[in-house]
Amino acid sequence: MGARRTRGAKFMRMTFHLILGAAALLATASVSAVPKGDEPIAVPRTIKQGIDFVYVDPQMSSVAKRRQRPQNWLQRVLSFDSGASSRKNAPNPLFVQLGRGLQQYQASWGRLPQVKIPAGAALRRGSTGKRVDLLRTRLGLSPGGGYDEQLVQIVTAYQGVHGLSPADGIAGKATIASLNRGATYYARRIAINLERAYRLPPTRTFNRYVVVDSGAAETYLFDRDRVADRMRVVVGSAKTKTPMMAVIMRSAKVNPYWNVPPELIQSLTAKRVNEQGLSYLKDFHYEVLSDWTATAQLVEPKTINWKQVAKGKSGILVRQLPGPWNSMGNMKFEMPNDYGIYLHDTPHKELFAENDRWLSNGCVRLQDYRRFATWVFGDVPQAASPREQRFELPRPVPIYMTYLTVAPSANGVVFRPDPYGLDALAMPQMFGAPSKMASAFDPKQTAGGG
């Protein structure tokens, strides 16, 4: 067994020699103060977007600074031993699972011939010809057998691992494009996600913490490094991404106001007022304020030049009143940050039944705020009146907002779509120029679709 493991580790290092070059290119996660500014989110230049967190709270920054990143971490992953000693020395369980997944991916798909298959009509059961022979070779079968049942099963398995839907055994345009990207491309995507996993809390750092995964549009509640609960969330769209940041949740508000971000006042609120008149504000329970202080005065909407607001030449402050119509729903969980990002309830529960949940303006909408509040407080806080009321958390809870496009599975990994395009952004940061096989195809094309 030991000899086999040694041979396997050597093979991994040989097969993924391009990946190993990343070790020299990667640096410790940058720690930087969050810049002041309105939406859209302005990320510090020192941050590698798609890889690093913005550490908002000084306590989170100090945790990040204490971590010493091993220079040869990627080599360690490729020669990973799944024994107890390796698990003990790993930064966190997800890192271990993805490291094992990288090995299993290499064993299942990395050693296959990396031949190119020309574009053409979809290939399916019964198809024959040169392209079918190339497909068989690419997937480790001998040529000449046609598109038989064995090939159907292997194509179906490949589609399932690589996030190609439907996984129907038909080699269509997206499947051929995925195969032509080559194993190095996908191994690098696993490595990018290992980088993201490395930045999550090390084992035994916090008793309780929350991980918001914008790549999966899901949230995980951790008790002593084990998932105590999970739920679907709605996160930012591709245009208004939920940022990768580490922050501490310290309070929550029941019956919250929604303070409309300046960008939305210009692009949405002012536009609707100009189209529908001032009645729009009343119909949707908006009010204009003089400032954000406790003694703020209401501003008469008819005194405002809404056309100038829509052009961005006049700034105003708008908030939505508490109630069933409010975009924050019944409860907002506050995490002090200059991005205006919160976890909150929503009146639009129907969205959680959808697979496409990349719909918000950057905030995180919770599928079940009551379940979340019970985990945080021990019970759901009750306001004394319909007015907004603030509740301090019994203990501050760290929140890690990450972005994972590869998930560990029983047989290795499963690739997800890259809705924010952050894998494509991180690829040159980690590896320089794309590999020849990857660059031969459109880098903007997603892996999804059969």
Language model features by range: what are they?
Residues 27-32:
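N-terminal signal peptide c-region/cleavage motif recognized by signal peptidases
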Residues 34-142, 149, 156-167, 173-450:
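Well-ordered beta-sheet/strand-loop patches within structured domains
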Residues 5-19:
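Bacterial N-terminal signal peptides that target proteins for export
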Residues 20-25:
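Hydrophobic helical h-region of N-terminal Sec-dependent signal peptides
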